[in-house]
């Protein structure tokens, strides 16, 4: 019995709950509209616009002005977009890219690196990827009836997320002092 391989618990498996793609333009108008078209072309979904929380005169931003757009992708499409985004980063992330709640995020400089054909009328936009990880059973915290908390032992930690990234994508996690390209 000791020689047999220990079976893994399927409830402990980590999966991607959602992937959020964000382009923050910093101004409303034509550039923001073109950025939303890039996200729509990439994800096949209609993006949502984010408004400024408060006025910043030095940046020329007014409160409630639309300054960014984002789209939330789930399922197989999220995995494909995450794979292409990590390919741009060469599967290298910094340790500080991972949060304590087991999520991680990174940014890319140019959206055309993801395989979208360059269009001069659109321009080039950078974007942020934010990945939320979960385990089976997280629904108890989100459901409408009989909500409960996810236990501490079952939550995804920073170490769990980093280990998942290294195993699933054979990724490299760098410390801040090491150089990173991308």
Swiss-Prot record:
It is found in: Nucleus; Cytoplasm. The keyword Cell wall biogenesis/degradation does not apply. Signal peptide: none annotated. One of its GO terms (biological process) is translation. Component of the large ribosomal subunit. Interacts with DEK3. Belongs to the universal ribosomal protein uL5 family. Component of the ribosome, a large ribonucleoprotein complex responsible for the synthesis of proteins in the cell. The small ribosomal subunit (SSU) binds messenger RNAs (mRNAs) and translates the encoded message by selecting cognate aminoacyl-transfer RNA (tRNA) molecules. The large subunit (LSU) contains the ribosomal catalytic site termed the peptidyl transferase center (PTC), which catalyzes the formation of peptide bonds, thereby polymerizing the amino acids delivered by tRNAs into a polypeptide chain. There are four genes for RPL11 in A.thaliana. This is Large ribosomal subunit protein uL5z. It comes from Arabidopsis thaliana (Mouse-ear cress).
């Amino acid at each position: 019995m000791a020689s047999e391989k220990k079976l893994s618990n399927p409830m402990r498996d980590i999966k991607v709950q959602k992937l959020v793609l964000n382009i923050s333009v910093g101004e409303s108008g034509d550039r923001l509209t073109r950025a939303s078209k890039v996200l729509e072309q990439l994800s096949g979904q209609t993006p949502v616009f984010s408004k400024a929380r408060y006025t910043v005169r030095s940046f020329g931003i007014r409160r409630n002005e639309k300054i960014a757009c984002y789209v939330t992708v789930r399922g197989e499409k999220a995995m494909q977009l995450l794979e292409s985004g990590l390919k741009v980063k060469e599967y290298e992330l910094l340790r500080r890219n991972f949060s304590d709640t087991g999520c991680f995020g990174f940014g890319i400089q140019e959206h055309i690196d993801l395989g979208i054909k360059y269009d001069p009328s659109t321009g080039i936009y950078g974007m942020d990827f934010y990945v939320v990880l979960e385990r089976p059973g997280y629904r108890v915290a989100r459901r409408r009836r009989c909500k409960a908390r996810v236990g501490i032992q079952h939550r995804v930690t920073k170490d769990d997320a980093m280990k998942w990234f290294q195993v699933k994508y054979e990724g490299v996690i760098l410390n801040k002092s090491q150089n990173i390209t991308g």
